[in-house]
Every structure is written in C-alpha cells, then in structure tokens.
Amino acid sequence: MIVPSFPGFGFSSPLPDNPDMNFWKVADLWHSLMTDILGHERYAAGGCDVGALVCGQLGHKYAGELYGIHAQVVALEKRFAVHLAAHVLAPSTLAYGLSDSPAGMLAWILERWVNWSDNGGDIEHVFSKDDLCTHATIYWVTNSIGTSIRTYANNNRYPWVPSHDRQPPVEAPTGITFVGYENPPGVSTDRRVQHFLESDRAGWYNLVNLTAHDHGGHFIPWEIPDQWVDDLRRTFREPAPTTRSEAGPSWPS
C-alpha cells in the first residue's frame, strides 16, 4: 500500500514551480509516481474529499492502467458552504489569519472535525485529544494551512479539462462509499444507493460497487476504517456490479 502526501498538505511541501497545482494535476503526479518511478504497470486508487477528486481523474485519464478506483462522494450541503466559500473566494486572507495564530488555526480545524464527523456529540468518540493535537501540529510546524487552502482555490480557478469524450467519463471500475451522516436531507441509508443511481452523477462512473453505511461521517477512513477497507476490497475484487447497505446486499435489476 502506498500513501502519497498531497502537495502542500503537511508532510508534502508545496511545489514552487507549480502555483496552479490542483486535483487533476496531482493525479498526473501520482500516476507518474506509480508507473514511472515505482514501476507498477497497473494499480488501484482510493480516496476521500480532495483525494476522491484525484481518484476520479485517475479513473478518467488513466483507466486502462487501473484495476479500479474507490471514493467517497460528498453531498454538497449548507454545512460545507462557509468552508468552500472561504477557501475558494478568499484563500489568502484566511491563510494569513490561520498561519499567525495556532489557537485560531486549531479552532478552524476543530470546528470542522466536530461538525463533520459522526461523533454523537462527543468529538473524542472519534478523535482523541492526542489525535486532534497531532493533526493540528502537522499543519502548524510545516506552515501548510495556507497551501492546503490554496488547493481548493486552484480547483476552481483552473477548471477541469477532459482527456477524452467517451462515456462514462470515468471508465475505470468504480466503487463508492456512502455514510449516514452525509445522507442528503430526506434520504435514509437504505435509500442512499438508489438515490445516487437515480441522479445525474451516477452516469459519470463505471460503477461496480456501491455501499451505504448507517454510521460514519466525512472522515471515513478514520471513523470507520474496517468498513472502508472492506469496501475497497470489494471494489477491486468484485466480478459484477453490487450494491450494499448495512441491511445487507442487493443486486441491481
């Protein structure tokens, strides 16, 4: 298993010669890492949040060299509105403030961990104090909160350019994990898969595995790691399309 660090996020320094770095350019870097540098002829990719965007681009541009991709699909809700607006519209203003105050940066990050995780009102049910301080310290000591924010602005500023016009756009076998805490309003977990299949977004993917879990929030690999790993394995091994909820498997008609 290979876990690359996203440029500008914590462990990975920003690339000074690539100020326009965004998710689809990161996909090119990761594909080069896997094939040219590490020598893999084929590989599989999984990710959440911005990592899910990278996986989607890999499955679009490099489908023939992937066993498949597995990702989280986020329902765009009002709880994410302030976060996205600030990152996209005023990244530098926000970055200066957060880079100047460790307490301010921790408060900004903590608010998202509290509100976006399925914690039942107790954040330490998901993240221990040590986890929280470790995550925040990685951003602080590397001074990378600003460069991480810039990625969101670049995703919007430099729009995605398709590599081909074939259908579906993401041709690699694709699995998706849904979690109850991010169900759209009025949609229960047992209806989540069907709700997605009836949406326009489903047509973007060569779907082979859709799984909905009652529990779990935005930070899926951290919150429900065992289920996430099981979902990945099914996607990369599944011989035929499947859908599952925590009530059990079902088969598309």
For each feature predicted by the language model, list its residue ranges.
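Conserved HGGG/HGGXW glycine-rich cap/lid loop of the alpha/beta-hydrolase fold
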Residues: 1-12, 35, 236, 240
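Conserved Rossmann-like nucleotide-binding pocket used by diverse enzymes
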Residues: 2, 46, 209
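Residue in the alpha/beta-hydrolase core beta-strand immediately N-terminal to the catalytic nucleophile
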Residues: 5, 43-44, 48, 67-70
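Glycine-rich "HGGG/HGxG" loop immediately N-terminal to the catalytic nucleophile
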Residues: 6-21, 56, 80
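Conserved acidic catalytic loop of the alpha/beta-hydrolase fold
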Residues: 24-43, 53, 61
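Glycine-rich nucleophile elbow surrounding the catalytic serine of serine-hydrolase chemistry
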Residues: 47-57
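A catalytic-pocket lid/entrance helix-loop region that shapes and gates access to the active site
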Residues: 57-92
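C-terminal subdomain of alpha/beta-hydrolase-fold enzymes, centered on the catalytic histidine
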Residues: 89-253
